[in-house]
Amino acid sequence: MTESERTSHLDILYENQRGIMLCGVPYFSEKSLLNFDPAPWVDQHFVASPVSTKTATCPDPSWEWAWQRWYIDMSGDVDESGWQYGFSFTMNNWHGKPVSLHSFVRRRRWIRKRKKKELRRDELPLVPESFTISSSYPIQRSSTQTRSSFEDDSSDFDLSEVTTIPALLRALQDSRIDREKLEALATFLASASIDEKVYVKNCKKDLLKNFVFEHSCRKANELLNASLTAAEASTSQVALRESPTPQD
């Protein structure tokens, strides 16, 4: 287990529903699940979970939530609400577009990051300022090295990997300064689909809470608005070009 895995963890819950498509409209509910279906909520190993996103808590007091709430994983082949559809839960053939007579069940993935609580100074274990291997050679603790471990401003993520919504959320949480958060947001928006941009904009209020300074929040808001406006304009132009030309 890496140091990152010991100090942070991404909790995963799957939400399951059964239903049917009528005239292109999905009618699904967890109350429609059959006896042989999985539970309404299952964990990352698809084992029935006694909790949902509304009731889940950290496993013990040494953990706390790094993210303020649960997020729908919008990566992969999903619809605008994060659902994947299939013929049955036992078949591993999930798709983001519901198809009549082939979409009787659906699921979506929820994620939330938690982290180990940081000990306050008065909770740190007592360690002597020096210790001795032999009576002749005292070994002094390096205060410079200790400070550097707390003052390191480098982040643990690679900007090139910020191409999905979960990766963006992780980057915003892990970044220590607003400049890095803005770079992560700009990188994501450069490759995001219009649906992803709409989703992020709808979560804008929670997203902006990750920024420390007001001017950074304004800059992030400008990036979101400009990116979505450009994407919508591009989509409109494509639609106009593809529309049939009236014949004389």
UniProtKB/Swiss-Prot annotation:
Which residues does UniProt assign to the signal peptide? none
Q: Is Hydrolase included in the keywords of this UniProt record?
A: no
Q: Which GO terms describe its biological process?
A: ascospore wall assembly; macroautophagy; peroxisome organization
Instruction: State the coiled-coil residue ranges.
Output: none
InterPro entries reported in the protein's UniProt record: Peroxin/Ferlin, TECPR1-like_DysF, Tectonin_beta-propeller
The record's listing under Pfam families reads: Pex24p
Which domain of life does this protein belong to? Answer: Eukaryota
Q: GO CC terms on record?
A: peroxisomal membrane; prospore membrane
Please tell me whether the keyword Transcription regulation is annotated for this protein: no
Q: Which UniProt keywords apply?
A: Meiosis
Q: What does this protein do?
A: Has a role in meiosis.
Protein's name in the database = Meiotically up-regulated gene 65 protein
Its source organism is Schizosaccharomyces pombe (strain 972 / ATCC 24843) (Fission yeast)
